[in-house]
A protein has these predicted regions:
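Membrane-embedded transmembrane-helix bundle of lipid-linked glycan/lipid transferases
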Residues: 1-247, 308, 319-324, 331, ...
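Short beta-strand micro-motifs in enzyme catalytic cores
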Residues: 358-360, 518, 529, 581, ...
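Active-site-proximal, structured, solvent-exposed surfaces of multi-pass membrane proteins
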Residues: 380-382, 562-667
């Protein structure tokens, strides 16, 4: 619905942009401002996309003789329209997809890409493939003709249409990943924006003779006819999806999870929750959820058949019922017996099995929270990959080691630093030394150590990561007196640009490279508890699961991939009250201390305030024992008000500037 409303408003916005751009009518700025505000509160991601599309259109429309004043005023007006809605905008940008890590955001972006062979194939709609993205061969042909034949000042929309078409292809994804605001670059959704500016340029093509105008209209209409057969879009819910939704609804006490990578369609998101049904972990627009990262990792675990992680984290999310689409079992060589064994480790029992789906039920209270003890914590940008491979580790909430207290980190057996950051290297090194002295095993992934601000070298605790490039596979490793071989690098990473270790006194692992023995693993000269690992070996193991690499990584970390965190289910109750909720934990086992952190299995929201201590742990709301009263408070209200004031002031300045320029022009 929000996208439909935006599609309705977009032509009017483009009209006002055209009026000011071509005729410099000041009243058009009011239209741009109001429509930008309306679209902002309708769909924040779409206004970001429209802003990007408008910027590109105005960039292509720029002509030296005309200057850039009008283009700048239009863009500034749109920015002010967004800022004026700051009271709503600032809270909406907190959490969800805006805070999604780059890897997860990249996976979402991939879902909104399409090969040219599909996006320019009109037969897909005729053959019944209604789910395929179709850009429009007619739009492409007319855009090419417009670029070649239209007036230079009136072809910007044609250029934009072709540029957006190219940007919808998977080949461009590596570039888009590195762009600012990449979370908003769901490229196939830019199509409606491309259409809007395309039709603007088509209307402006004044030299187009009447026969060619008629021919253009005919081409567009003929291309659109298959899309007008609306009955083919009235598709009944997938029978398997309906059946699974009913199965989950009838067997769930607290929350259900369907692991199907959305292959069963959108119905389960609706069907599980209807008729007095159950809560649901996913939901069709899960990308905007506070638990978007958690959900993305569950999907990734299913794709990689990492069932230990999938089912353990399902407990963390409060799923007492988990259904797995059977077509994904075996994709990486696992069997249903392997899945059942992983389920048993997390307390699940296989209760239903068909050729379509298998259903697992958690043994425990109907409504429960979770107390968890992890073996270790991974701090840094690449934490998620490590936790997928070693589920007994948790991913830290921050990549900056200085955001943690030493006492907090001392509660873990192992701390892994991979892609981490710090404010001052000296303080970070002191923290690591202190942890090691207290008996904590600290593993430093030297491949992703921050570069020194002065020397630009990747150095930490006197150990340096030196660049090296390997082809196809690692050399044979010499580790702990044993020769260890590994399989090749992933096909898309055949050239492995990484680094070896120098400066370490106690080398534990070496490899031969150009007649030299170079180090890839070592321990600190002052503490056996500090371990260095290079060659991006941790990442390699996380993506390949190679048995040779597993031997080394398992020894360095001191844990097995099969290990799981220790979880205890606690009976819990929650009740929504007027303007808040009450969470009660009265029946905690005797071995659970009063100071225990209890994951309520409810997503943490920034609207929660309480006189009791509440915490955000891995995007979940955590409380203590007893009764916790939580009130709902409008989040980030005053920062939002400040942003709105900035927007009003900015628009006032733009209006004054536009009036002055108009007066000068009139004189």
């Amino acid at each position: 619905m929000p996208r439909m409303v935006v599609s309705f408003l977009l032509p009017y916005l483009i009209y006002f942009i055209w009026v000011y751009l071509r005729e410099e009518k000041r009243w058009a700025l009011a239209g741009i401002l109001i429509l930008t505000m309306l679209i902002t509160v309708t769909h924040i991601m779409m206004i970001a996309m429209i802003g990007i599309g408008t910027f590109l259109f105005l960039l292509f429309d720029h002509h030296r003789k005309m200057g850039i004043r009008r283009q700048v005023i239009i863009l500034l007006t749109m920015i002010c329209g967004i800022l004026i809605m700051g009271v709503w905008l600032v809270p909406s940008l907190s959490g969800g997809i805006s805070s999604m890590d780059s890897e997860a955001a990249s996976d979402v972006m991939t879902m909104w890409m399409s090969d040219l062979s599909s996006s320019l194939n009109p037969l897909n709609r005729i053959n019944g493939d209604i789910g395929a993205f179709y850009f429009g061969i007619s739009v492409v042909l007319l855009s090419i003709a417009g670029i070649l034949l239209a007036d230079n000042k009136k072809k910007s929309g044609f250029i934009l249409a072709l540029v957006i078409l190219v940007l919808t292809t998977p080949d461009v994804l590596p570039i888009l990943r590195k762009m600012p605001m990449s979370q908003a670059l769901w490229m196939t959704r830019f199509t409606v924006i491309a259409y809007g500016f395309f039709f603007l340029s088509l209307i402006e093509w004044e030299r187009l003779r009447k026969p060619f105008v008629i021919a253009s209209v005919i081409i567009l209409v003929v291309d659109a006819i298959p899309s007008f057969t609306f009955e083919r879009y009235s598709v009944p819910a997938n029978d398997d999806g309906v059946a699974v939704a009913g199965l989950l609804r009838d067997n769930t006490s607290q929350r259900a999870s369907l692991m199907d990578l959305s292959s069963l369609g959108s119905y389960p998101s609706y069907g599980v929750c209807t008729d007095g049904g159950a809560s649901y972990t996913f939901g069709w627009a899960w990308q905007g959820a506070a638990t978007a990262d958690n959900i993305m990792l569950l999907n990734q675990a299913l794709e990689n058949e990492q069932y230990d992680y999938l089912l353990d984290r399902s407990v963390e999310l409060g799923d007492d019922t988990v259904a797995i689409d059977r077509k994904y079992i075996g994709a990486k060589g696992k069997t249903l017996d392997d899945v059942t064994a992983s389920a048993k480790k997390s307390g699940y029992t296989l209760t239903y099995e068909s050729d379509k789906v298998c259903l697992f039920k958690l043994d425990g209270p109907e409504k429960f929270g979770v107390v968890t003890q992890y073996d270790g914590i991974v701090i840094g940008d690449y934490a998620d990959g490590i936790t997928l491979a070693f589920p007994s580790f948790k991913a830290g909430m921050s990549s900056n080691i200085e955001d943690y207290s030493t006492d907090e980190l001392k509660s873990y057996h192992t701390v892994i630093l991979t892609g981490f950051s710090y404010d001052t290297r000296q303080k970070a090194e002191e923290m690591v030394r202190s942890l090691a002295d207290s008996g904590v095993n600290v593993v430093i992934d030297m491949t992703h150590v921050p570069a020194d601000s002065a020397t630009r070298q990747h150095v930490f605790l006197g150990v340096t990561d030196m660049s090296v490039s390997l082809k196809s596979s690692y050399p044979i490793f010499s580790y702990d007196g044993e020769q260890i071989s590994t399989t090749g690098f992933p096909d898309d990473m055949s050239e492995w640009n990484t680094g070896y270790i120098t400066g370490a006194m106690n080398v534990t692992g070496t490899f031969a490279y150009e007649m030299e023995q170079l180090a890839f693993a070592a321990t600190d000269e002052n503490s056996q508890n500090i371990k260095y690992v290079g060659l991006n070996l941790l990442y390699y193991y996380s993506v390949t699961g190679d048995s040779g690499a597993e031997k080394i990584v398992e020894d360095i970390l001191g844990v097995c991939p099969e290990d799981l965190p220790e979880r205890t289910l606690i009976p819990i109750s929650s009740e929504i009250t007027d303007g808040g909720m009450v969470i009660t934990v009265n029946d905690a086992p005797a071995d659970i201390a009063d100071g225990a952190v209890i994951n309520t299995t409810l997503a943490y929201q920034d609207i929660f305030v309480s006189d009791s201590e509440i915490m955000d742990e891995n995007n979940m709301l955590c409380v203590g024992t007893g009764v916790t009263n939580i009130k709902f408070k409008y989040p980030l209200f005053w920062p939002g008000v400040l942003v709105s004031i900035v927007g009003f002031c900015g628009m006032s300045a733009i209006w004054i500037l536009a009036c002055k320029d108009y007066g000068k022009k009139k004189d």
